[in-house]
Amino acid sequence: MYAYSGINLTHNAWSPIVLELKTIAENLSSSKLNSVLINRYRNGLDSVSWHADDEKELGDDPVIVSFSFGVPRKFQIKPKDKSDKRRYLFSLDHGSVMIMHGNFQAHWLHQVPKEPKIETERINLTFRYITSVS
């Protein structure tokens, strides 16, 4: 069982399209991936707050490959070190792929902030490798 945002998730079979995206993600990242989280952002009020994908089940220096489909959304990153005031903003456009790897999760937080003016949806698939199940 893998827990995400306080929710225990169970295993489901890979659909053909998700399996195809997994293969693309593995080729782009040169990594083996065995799990995907699929999130639906119904509109700009759906968001994910500042966090790092640093759960122990992901191991050291996890590789996260993220596909975005639908309306573009903002993606922000900032250092975990509160004394470091750097901030970066990216656009997750339809069809884009973002890869976080190396020690990114150890040193950075990221979020998809609320954007109240957005009225259409976005689907996000994040592939990763789960090293152990608690």
What is each of the regions a protein language model found here?
Residues 1-134:
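Non-heme Fe(II) oxygenase metal-center motifs and adjacent flexible, charged/small-residue loops
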